[in-house]
Amino acid sequence: MNQFVEALISQEKSNLIPDEYDYWKDLIGSWSLDYVEGYGTPNERHVRGEWHFARILEGLGIQDIFICPARSERIDTRQGEYGTTIRMYNPAKKQWDMVYTCLENMSRFVGTKENGRVVLTNIHNKRNRWVFTDISKDKFHWQNETDMKDGTLKIWCEVFGTRQ
């Protein structure tokens, strides 16, 4: 297994990724999460989670592992979500090609930067986005949002991350 990890994980970004497209550099590492559904409603729910990011494949990609609830809080393995995203920089398109998978789900996204936000647009439903904002060395904010047909913005869930 060590050879697999050594071949997968990279310590540095590839020179093929321009600095201005290295959107994930401040997320590399491990994070504690406050996952929030129904923010500001009577059904508001908070779950503690964890999120880990690493450079992969000679620095050409970024992979994460999203675990919610956190491993220390899980009652059984079917509870919550345990998934991974693989992001590969596409120099021809100057964007990130991405896939997220977890049990019974596989979603593809395109990652770009818009107005200081890292926006991951679902390629099968362009009204749905995953958005990273307020990324710093110690914290970040993420939300799953959809432009609804009636013109409103629906925020399905949010994550507030703090570095471990």
Regions found by a protein language model. Give the residues of each.
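Hydrophobic small-molecule pocket/channel-lining residues, especially in calycin-type beta-barrels
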Residues: M1-Q164
